[in-house]
């Protein structure tokens, strides 16, 4: 793989199902040595994770990074809060968007870029139950149309 290309290590498919993603931001993650080894081995779960902004800093919360098998005493807590590396203007922009608007920050995927672990954070607004059903219905219709077009073109 060429330098600069992202190698996706984990995705949060549930986030796109549960939220409308308004905008996305790429952020670096502050990790310990054994954590980055676990991340490179794709032993990370984003399912229950979210990001929050406290005291002008962005933090990644509830993201599980499995302990590194050979790490023994140097392994950190798998559920610890990890700092996100964002520019000050990005943090203030996200903080302003989050104020009283029913929005949240959800991690969408973790990948390697130029050897560094990056997380794609989505500014998200929660979906209602009927929105989720509508999304599933639309996806099924598109799948059926593709199937019929494939069958039609095969003749």
Curated annotation (Swiss-Prot):
Is Transcription regulation one of the keywords? no
What the entry lists under InterPro entries is as follows: SmpB, SsrA-bd_prot, SsrA-bd_prot_CS
**The entry's keywords:** Cytoplasm, RNA-binding
Annotated coiled-coil positions are none
Record keyword Cytoplasm present: yes
Q: Which domain of life is it from?
A: Bacteria
Which biological process annotations from GO are given for this protein? trans-translation
Where found in the cell? Answer: Cytoplasm
Q: Where is this region: Disordered?
A: 135-155
The UniProt entry, under Pfam families, shows: SmpB
One GO cellular component assignment for this chain's record is: cytosol
Q: From start to end residue, where is composition biased (Basic and acidic residues)?
A: 135-147
**Molecular function per GO:** RNA binding
What functional role does this protein have?
Answer: Required for rescue of stalled ribosomes mediated by trans-translation. Binds to transfer-messenger RNA (tmRNA), required for stable association of tmRNA with ribosomes. tmRNA and SmpB together mimic tRNA shape, replacing the anticodon stem-loop with SmpB. tmRNA is encoded by the ssrA gene; the 2 termini fold to resemble tRNA(Ala) and it encodes a 'tag peptide', a short internal open reading frame. During trans-translation Ala-aminoacylated tmRNA acts like a tRNA, entering the A-site of stalled ribosomes, displacing the stalled mRNA.
Instruction: Spell out the PANTHER family in the cross-references.
Output: SSRA-BINDING PROTEIN, TMRNA-BINDING COMPONENT OF TRANS-TRANSLATION TAGGING COMPLEX
Please report the name of this protein according to its UniProt entry: SsrA-binding protein
Question: Per the UniProt entry, what species is this protein from, by scientific name?
Answer: Streptococcus pyogenes serotype M12 (strain MGAS2096)
Q: Which gene encodes it?
A: smpB
